[in-house]
Amino acid sequence: MKVLISGSSSGIGLEVAKRFLKEGYMVIGFDLKESKIDNPFYLHYQIDIKNKEDLPDIDGDIEFIFNNAGLQNSEDDIDNNLKGAINVTEKYAFNKNIKSVLFNASASARSGDEFPLYVASKAGLVGYMKNVAIRLAPYGATCNSISLGGVLTSSNDEVIKDK
């Protein structure tokens, strides 16, 4: 199975990539940062997913996409978190071998807590996920989102310190 993970260089994305590699999958990672993974079954692209033209052509069909890339409390929250996920999904998801698309939304999408642009971007992801689920149904694929609360990653330092 070929897996695509955005935001694969740290936090949740890094750990998910490691897990898929441990299970023997081919993993393709997208991130603004360099990869910390050294594995022959891992292919890393240091790219900005909010720029459609930066997305590479990939040989073979992607079977699982984890839209995980996310910024918090920046002017780029909507462009990165929502538009970036849309760019990745629209380019790679609609193929005959797709099995599943998963979005890392946030509990903030429901509660409205935290930063305004972040909340809007994550709530938008939930709505977009529903749209993708309808369009993926003819492929026999699933589409879901997870809405985690606070996770101890470097991107949550500001929230955890309550500043």
Residue ranges and their predicted role:
Residues F66, L102, C143-I146, N156:
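Hydrophobic structural elements of the Rossmann-like NAD(P)H-binding subdomain
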Residues S100-G124, M129-P138, G150-L152:
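Catalytic loop of short-chain dehydrogenase/reductase
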